[in-house]
């Protein structure tokens, strides 16, 4: 598209002595046009073109302006034409946001406005005068203007045909390269490559029915490979079955078109069956081999190879689906990279621990979130879990990455069950008699226990994860290996044994006159405190959003976060429109007035309101604890 040349500056509302409006007529980008002083609301300049032209596109380089508008007019009305003689060519367009204007960042943004961005009625006419209006209402610290402006006319048909004809003969120094193909006028990216493939395929197949037959065999081979990928696993070291000689060239051309993702997925899929072979027991191996010979497609369809073959970039967002992560102890930029990788794998992110959170990714122990989640019974893992899942492109069991101090087998095996179902095929028959194993494990050897707060309160990520966790609990009890590591079960057993040993002691002495009645009531009628379920916390802060402002003495900030989270409240990291209550230990601040102007429903309260609600175990009126401006 040819560039429209500018003749001179007709008028200018404001210009600097150094950065004058005539700089827009020059091609150098470092020559700018700026206002005479800072703080001007709008500035404008009128430029005269060489002749009447139809404007096809506009290129504008900014220099601190927030908005730019382009109008067009005709010099037939005289140099002192009014505003009514100008028509809008480009509506007011934004070049800097309010935050960028106040901070002074990105002042030299360049935008190209094509014919689809211009007003059609004005772009179809011919003009010889252009008026540019710039404004900056957000910043009054520095002058603003434009770096450059360029106008382009629509390309001519003769020039387009001339350029298309010049493509056929190209001169490189003293040599001239001539195209042999007659269809060189309509060259497209990749056209020569595909024409070469068509030539080789037509030369190899003489009959005209060849391409349709090759397409049919291609569809049949792709359907067979997607239905049963068994030969890839069996003959991992050998080459795949050779096609007929007549179609070999066609298959070679198709292999060139295959994406490089399948060869990269090959080594990972070949290594995984080797890991599952030693886990088979000698008794289960001979029983499984006849079943594999009889029905070769079914067990391999349930194994690792189809899942490994399907695992690719298109399923990357489903690897950690249903997982809600919270980060603790990391600093930027690694914190943002770790969060982006978790979100890329399909997980959800929370800034603080919420009831729907499933994993706390901690850099080191003894952080405030670490202590909070450890007290609530959550799962705390290292950062390597997310990094390895992202690197391996599959979900790994989180129990391998648990931080020190957590030994809950039922929670740890929840992930291992879902992963073992994907990784190890021989374990599937062992998990089918699940109800029997659960009833046997719940026999006299293991006394019944009430549900813990984790089982009653913590919501499960999904129905599938819940069933997987129960299945792994029953399997862990059958094996008996993980039962010793369950700290809560051991504490309950020890407490119950102590209660069973304590009643006979006063009866043997016989000196306590109140021993008989209290023992009978304790053993037969009232249950012990250890058998009672832990009461659930009230959720009177549900649906309320809090923001902690200012400094708090000692560990008061940690206590406030703990109470708000315990009563199902939401804590915001920064001030936004969702905040309803601002908790502060300071007096009235001038910033509170600005916040009230933007959000009149805000309430500024003392920390004592949170403590009083905790003592009364109900929601108290916050007006009694409000922060008001001093007279």
UniProtKB/Swiss-Prot annotation:
Q: Where in the cell is it found?
A: Nucleus; Chromosome
| Residues annotated with Phosphoserine modification | 142, 201, 206, 228, 261, 371, 408-410, 445-446, 460, 484, 517
Predominant subcellular localization, coarse grouping: nucleus
Q: Which residues form the BRCT domain?
A: 315-403, 536-627
Q: What happens when the gene is disrupted?
A: Embryonic lethal. Conditional knockout in brain causes cerebellar histopathology including increased apoptosis of cerebellar granule neurons, reduced numbers of cerebellar interneurons and decreased electrophysiological spike activity in Purkinje cells. Mutant mice exhibit cerebellar ataxia and elevated levels of ADP-ribose in cerebellum. Double knockout with PARP1 restores the normal interneuron density and ADP-ribose levels, reducing cerebellar ataxia in comparison to the single XRCC1 knockout mice.
For whether the record's keyword set contains Ubl conjugation, the answer is yes
Role summary: Scaffold protein involved in DNA single-strand break repair by mediating the assembly of DNA break repair protein complexes. Negatively regulates ADP-ribosyltransferase activity of PARP1 during base-excision repair in order to prevent excessive PARP1 activity. Recognizes and binds poly-ADP-ribose chains: specifically binds auto-poly-ADP-ribosylated PARP1, limiting its activity.
By what name is this protein known? DNA repair protein XRCC1
Write down the species.
Mus musculus
């Amino acid at each position: 598209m040819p560039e429209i040349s500018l003749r001179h500056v007709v008028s200018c509302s404001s210009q600097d002595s150094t950065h004058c409006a005539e700089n827009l007529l020059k091609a150098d980008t470092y020559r700018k046009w700026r206002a005479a002083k800072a703080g001007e609301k709008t500035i404008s300049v009128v430029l005269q073109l060489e002749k009447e032209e139809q404007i096809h596109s506009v290129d504008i380089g900014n220099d601190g302006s927030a908005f730019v508008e382009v109008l067009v007019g005709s010099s037939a009305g005289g140099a002192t034409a009014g505003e009514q003689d100008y028509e809008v060519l480009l509506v007011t367009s934004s070049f800097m946001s309010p935050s960028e204007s106040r901070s002074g960042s990105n002042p030299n943004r360049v935008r190209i406005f094509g014919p689809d961005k211009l007003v059609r009625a004005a772009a179809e006419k011919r003009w010889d005068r252009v008026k540019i209006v710039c404004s900056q209402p957000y910043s009054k610290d520095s002058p603003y203007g434009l770096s450059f402006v360029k106008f382009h006319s629509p390309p001519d048909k003769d020039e387009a045909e001339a350029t298309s004809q010049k493509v056929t003969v190209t001169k490189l120094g003293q040599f001239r390269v001539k195209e042999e193909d007659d269809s060189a006028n309509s060259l497209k990216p990749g056209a020569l490559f595909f024409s070469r493939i068509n030539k080789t395929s037509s030369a190899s197949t003489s009959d005209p029915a060849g391409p349709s037959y090759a397409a049919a065999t291609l569809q049949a081979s792709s359907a067979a490979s997607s239905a049963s990928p068994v030969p890839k696993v069996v003959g991992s070291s050998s080459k795949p079955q050779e096609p007929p000689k007549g179609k070999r060239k066609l298959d070679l051309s198709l292999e060139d078109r295959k994406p490089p993702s399948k060869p990269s997925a090959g080594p990972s899929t070949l290594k995984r069956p080797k890991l599952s072979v030693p886990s088979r027991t000698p008794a289960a191996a001979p029983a499984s081999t006849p079943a594999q010979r009889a029905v070769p497609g079914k067990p391999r369809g349930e194994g690792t190879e189809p899942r490994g073959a399907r695992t690719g970039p298109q399923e990357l967002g489903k690897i950690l689906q249903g997982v809600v992560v919270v980060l603790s102890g990391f600093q930027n930029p690694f914190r943002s990279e770790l969060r982006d990788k978790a979100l890329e794998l399909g997980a959800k992110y929370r800034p603080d621990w919420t009831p729907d959170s499933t994993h706390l990714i901690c850099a080191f122990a003894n952080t405030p979130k670490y202590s909070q989640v450890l007290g609530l019974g959550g799962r705390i893992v290292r950062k390597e879990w997310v990094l390895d899942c992202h690197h391996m492109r599959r979900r790994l069991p989180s129990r391998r990455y648990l931080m020190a101090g957590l030994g809950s087998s039922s929670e740890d095996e929840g992930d291992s069950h879902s992963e073992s179902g994907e990784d190890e095929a021989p374990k599937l028959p062992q998990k089918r008699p699940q109800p029997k194993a659960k009833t046997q494990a719940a026999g006299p050897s293991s006394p019944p226990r009430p549900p813990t707060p984790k089982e009653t309160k913590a919501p499960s990520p999904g129905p599938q994860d819940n069933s997987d966790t129960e299945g792994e609990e029953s399997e862990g009890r059958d094996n008996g290996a993980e039962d010793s590591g369950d700290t809560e079960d051991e504490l309950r057993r020890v407490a119950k044994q102590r209660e069973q040993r304590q009643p006979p002691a006063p009866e043997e002495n016989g000196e306590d006159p109140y021993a008989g009645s209290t023992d009978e009531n304790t053993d037969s009628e009232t249950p012990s405190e250890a058998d009672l379920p832990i009461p659930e916390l009230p959720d009177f802060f549900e649906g309320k959003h809090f923001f902690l402002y200012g400094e708090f003495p000692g560990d008061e900030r940690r206590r406030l976060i703990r109470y708000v989270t315990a009563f199902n409240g939401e804590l915001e990291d920064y001030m936004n429109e969702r905040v309803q209550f601002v908790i502060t230990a300071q007096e009235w601040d001038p910033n509170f007035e600005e916040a009230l102007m933007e959000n009149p429903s805000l309430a500024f309260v003392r920390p004592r309101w949170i403590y009083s609600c905790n003592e009364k175990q109900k929601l108290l009126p916050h007006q009694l604890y409000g922060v008001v401006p001093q007279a």
